[in-house]
């Protein structure tokens, strides 16, 4: 309780919800060849490499960071951070802006923000829970490893849920049940 939640920015969808991505591509006039505003193709954005964090985690541990929990944010989206065993509330105050790919998927599938953040990483790739006293040093080490990170939120006493304040979204523990 009281831990900071540090998010690392994602590089893309990380091979999750591929069926939904495929369905979205079929609805685009040019499919995977649809151009994004940065000049990349939709298909290239889908295939963005997944970041690997083994060296980063080792560096954090070597620098004395007291990591309490780590999770990737894939398949269940941001809801995945409540997979920790304890009954706690995860309050997200700050999030990365989703990549354009996610906005396109949302526009052609008509999914709500709640559906999108509950399915995709929406720009958040990895969550690291550390004591508040370690946040600054954690962010520094992450940046040294060439990743972007933010102090996204805090773990609080309460029922098992994730609250994404900037989007006014709340997920209860029941939303992690298999669909």
Report residues per predicted region:
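Phosphate/diphosphate-binding glycine-rich loops and adjacent basic-rich segments that engage nucleotide
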Residues: 1-35, 162
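Short, contiguous, pocket-lining structural segments
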Residues: 9-20, 45-52, 73
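Glycine-/charge-enriched secondary-structure boundary and capping motifs
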Residues: 38-43, 51-179
């Amino acid at each position: 309780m009281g831990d900071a939640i540090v998010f690392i920015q994602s590089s893309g969808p990380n091979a999750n919800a591929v069926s939904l991505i495929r369905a979205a591509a079929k609805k685009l006039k040019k499919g995977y060849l649809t151009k994004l505003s940065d000049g990349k193709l939709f298909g290239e954005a889908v295939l963005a490499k997944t970041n690997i964090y083994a060296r980063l985690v080792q560096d954090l541990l070597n620098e004395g960071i007291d990591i309490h929990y780590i999770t990737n944010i894939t398949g269940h989206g941001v809801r995945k951070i409540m997979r920790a065993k304890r009954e706690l509330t995860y309050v997200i105050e700050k999030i990365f802006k989703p990549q354009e790919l996610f906005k396109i998927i949302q526009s052609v599938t008509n999914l709500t923000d709640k559906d999108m953040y509950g399915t995709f990483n929406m720009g958040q790739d990895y969550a690291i829970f550390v004591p508040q006293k370690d946040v600054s040093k954690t962010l520094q080490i992450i940046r040294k490893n060439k990743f972007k990170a933010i102090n996204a939120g805090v773990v609080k006493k309460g029922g098992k849920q994730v609250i994404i304040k900037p989007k006014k979204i709340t997920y209860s523990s029941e939303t992690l049940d298999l669909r």
